[in-house]
Amino acid sequence: MGLAAVGMIFENLRTACRDGGNLQAREKMSLASTFAGLAFTRANVGYVHAIAHQFGGRYHTPHGLANAIVLPHVLRFSANAVTQRLAQLALRARLGDEDEDDEVLAAKFIDAVEQLNRDIGIPTQLDALQEADIPALARAALHEAHTGYPVPRYMTQEQCEELIRRLLPKASAAPSSPAPTRKPAAKKAAAKKLTTKPAATKRSASKA
């Protein structure tokens, strides 16, 4: 069911987002959602949901949006442990050929997920995320994942924090500093000294 869901998502999600009136694409996405739900009800979820739950709890981020933002990062973290399965997903999404190496197909799948996010307007950062919150978010996510989810590769606290930190909003450009108010006065004083020095020299010359 999971494979079928992935195939339908890659075939229909862009169309459904671009053209909400396309009932065929929306019907396929509804079916894909149902299949995916049935699949993870049996196989359970992992770090994507665990981290996304923390974003929802702290920042009220919609769960689907949080999942989409986190997904590519967790896929890259877990890729070496699930290369063959990612390759199967790539084939189902028609992203490559069976004669390609699993590593190549797995990389294509993750790249395609990132491209799909871009195509439908999913942000790459979480605007509400605060640096100070990251340690607590990571601890809560790991507690959730490690007590009930069959994750393919375990994260440490440091690794989870690093992953979440990649989602911090880009720092806004620092505003240009106003010109110091004392500089003109300093320039004026310097100019005054320059004008008085020649006069002093002239007086010295007359005495001689």
For the regions a language model picked out, list residue spans one by one.
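C-terminal charged capping/lid subdomain of soluble metabolic enzymes
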Residues: 86, 96-188, 192, 197, ...
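Active-site segments that bind and position negatively charged phosphate/pyrophosphate groups
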Residues: 1-112
